[in-house]
């Protein structure tokens, strides 16, 4: 499974690393890629560092981690240096460019995989829906598309977003957009890597419940990832 992380968090907690670790715990090999730092946001890379999980330095190292059943986060600078240089243009121009969208739909594996993708503005929903429905090569695998939680591809712990599943051009709604959850979980501060890491560890240790929206997202990912792998064999 491919899990991009390029937005980070400013106000809400960045729980994309939790999503990754829950999936790995369920036996799904996950390649997570993204930026390591953002001057205005808390990145997944910083949270992994706070968790004591080292970043993969190469594609081969990331593959070894996945084979060993470990979380594999690789910086985009190690995975695709030329794309990383284009992303750096954001700091110069002050706005995101098309590379920011392209990197989120990247599928780096030779074999089919499940991609988690997100959008932040309605026009990107239309564009990405058209791509996955009509243009994306079927042999590259399936994709989930959802409105990002501050841009990230993890479900909003306070309010589940709609998730669309694209498989061989067919679109299926897996999760409908929901109202604010009745039981809103206590979440860590969005800009604090150490507090977020502690909170994630408490969830993984069973001292806190997994937010319902994320638990449901994990279940869907496990199910569809298994279907994709079955089609490979």
Predicted region positions:
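Glycine-rich anion-binding loops and their surrounding alpha/beta cores
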Residues: 50-53, 61, 66-233
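A generic, well-ordered mixed alpha/beta core segment in the N-terminal half of proteins
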Residues: 1-65
């Amino acid at each position: 499974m491919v899990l991009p992380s390029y937005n980070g968090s400013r106000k809400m907690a960045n729980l994309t690393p939790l999503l990754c670790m829950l999936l790995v715990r369920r036996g799904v090999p996950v390649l997570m890629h993204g930026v390591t730092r953002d001057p205005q946001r808390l990145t997944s890379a910083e949270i992994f560092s706070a968790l004591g999980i080292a970043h993969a330095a190469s594609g081969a190292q990331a593959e070894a981690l996945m084979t060993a059943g470990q979380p594999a986060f690789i910086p985009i600078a190690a995975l695709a240096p030329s794309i990383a240089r284009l992303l750096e243009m954001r700091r110069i121009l002050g706005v995101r460019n098309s590379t920011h969208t392209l990197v989120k739909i990247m599928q780096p594996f030779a074999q089919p995989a499940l991609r988690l993708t997100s959008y932040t503005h309605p026009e990107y929903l239309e564009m990405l829906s058209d791509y996955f429905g009509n243009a994306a090569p079927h042999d590259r695998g399936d994709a989930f598309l959802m409105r990002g939680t501050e841009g990230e591809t993890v479900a909003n712990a306070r309010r589940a977003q709609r998730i669309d599943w694209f498989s061989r051009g067919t679109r299926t709604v897996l999760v409908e957009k929901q109202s604010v959850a009745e039981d809103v979980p206590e979440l860590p501060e969005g800009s604090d890597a150490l507090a977020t890491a502690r909170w994630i560890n408490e969830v993984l240790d069973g001292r806190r419940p997994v937010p319902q929206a994320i638990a449901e997202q994990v279940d869907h990912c496990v199910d569809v990832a298994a279907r994709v792998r079955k089609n490979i064999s």
